[in-house]
Amino acid sequence: MNKNTWVIGFTLFAMFFGAGNLIFPPNLGLDSGQFFWPAILAFVLTGIDLPLLGVIVGALDKEGYIGALNKISPKFSILFLIIIYLTIGPLFAIPRTASTSFEMTITPIIHSNSSIALFIFTIIYFIVVLYICLNPSKLIDRIGSLLTPLLLITILAMIIKGYLDFSGNTAGKGNEALYHSNFSSFAEGFTQGYLTMDAIAAIAFSMIVVNAVKLTGITKTNQIFKQTLTAGLIAAVALIFIYISLGYIGNHMPVSDMTLDQLKSKDRNIGTYLLTTMASTGFGSFGKYLLGIIVALACLTTACGLIGAVSEYFHRIVPKVSYKAFVLVFILMSFIIANQGLNAVISMSIPVLSIVYPVAITVVLLILIAKFIPTKRISQQIPVIIVFILSIFSVISKLGWLKINFIESLPLRAYSLEWFPVAIIATILGYLVGIFVKQDPIKYQQE
């Protein structure tokens, strides 16, 4: 394993390890109570395993996801990727990195969620992002060689001290309404993993990783696939350690019901409170500055990776507009949305993610299946269409806009996983229909 692979692996870790990866694991640990392990393992499944799979599947075709999705439908490829890139880009994920950075670096110092302070902070934050992203050829090196080592050292220090401070405590009762059995906890952890947005971000990051591997002189698809897999495993191991560690510490932190009620009444994010408490308990007044460094580095690396990926994709489909112009446009959009505040950004993203995630997971698995089992285009189109329509109606019903009895009666609906058995049935149906349709099996470009 050469130095380039390590740099790419660390870069991928840093791009994945952003705002949600910090605040969701300790929150999950607190809420899961006695059912921590099924919850955190499910969170790891959607927060790490699926993103890793998403990255390496993107290396199966010479043209990446653009080429693989074109096999399903060229129009679907463009529409789906635009939705993906906007979701994990300027509409939700990038603004969240800025608002999280503010809430965990500035708010503990000024003791308020001042909109003016947020405005000033986001201006400075996105100027730094702009500087790093303007030269895409240096993006990997700047993140992997400079920012990631600092991020790993600082967060490791906080995890070790947090474990020493809180591991002796017994786990709290947690949120018993959601976490009342092994299965309910697994299902809740699985859907909580959606909020990291990493499984759909993997589709975007795959392009950056594959391009970085190519820049090292590797051109054959099989070798690109192996290097991408190795880099992905490096990132995954680091993420698994950090997720479980932060979740475990959160699971053993004593937080009273009164404190939780106060946080909710002040619109404070509970995950950020847990991290702040962890840092201040372990390092005193210096803790908030240590946490600030961790958050700033984690969010900054993710924001840079996302801005770079989104801008490269849109420049590719609209070549008349330069990469730098797209960088400026998406940073401006992210700046505007970030100023709505952290909880607002998270709340806005949940319905969209509930539609996009099932489709993204289905697409990634269908591409992987087609690599090993002869698959016709119609066999991929049917499950994608069915899961997409089902996800839309599921969100409509969950939001209360229209009560759909059929949706509410589906298996696993109580756990927001009703799409999964439907996806399996739709995939089988697609293959049966494919038997009677005259189409050539899908072949991914290797050279």
Curated annotation (Swiss-Prot):
Keyword entries, A-Z: Amino-acid transport, Cell membrane, Membrane, Transmembrane, Transmembrane helix, Transport
Pfam families xrefs: Branch_AA_trans (PF05525)
Superkingdom assignment: Bacteria
Keyword Membrane: yes
InterPro entries found in the cross-reference section: Brnchd-chn_aa_trnsp_Livcs (IPR004685)
Gene Ontology CC: one annotated term: plasma membrane
Residue stretches spanning the membrane: 6-26, 40-60, 74-94, 114-134, 143-163, 193-213, 229-249, 290-310, 326-346, 350-370, 382-402, 417-437
Location(s), subcellular: Cell membrane
Any one GO molecular function term: L-leucine transmembrane transporter activity
Keyword Transport attached: yes
BP GO annotations: isoleucine transport; L-leucine transport
Membrane topology note: Multi-pass membrane protein
Family: Belongs to the branched chain amino acid transporter family.
Listed PANTHER family: BRANCHED-CHAIN AMINO ACID CARRIER PROTEIN SAOUHSC_01411-RELATED, BRANCHED-CHAIN AMINO ACID TRANSPORT SYSTEM 2 CARRIER PROTEIN
Function text: Component of the transport system for branched-chain amino acids (leucine, isoleucine and valine), which is coupled to a proton motive force (Potential). Contributes to NaCl tolerance.
Protein's UniProt name: Putative branched-chain amino acid carrier protein SAB1263c
Organism per entry: Staphylococcus aureus (strain bovine RF122 / ET3-1)
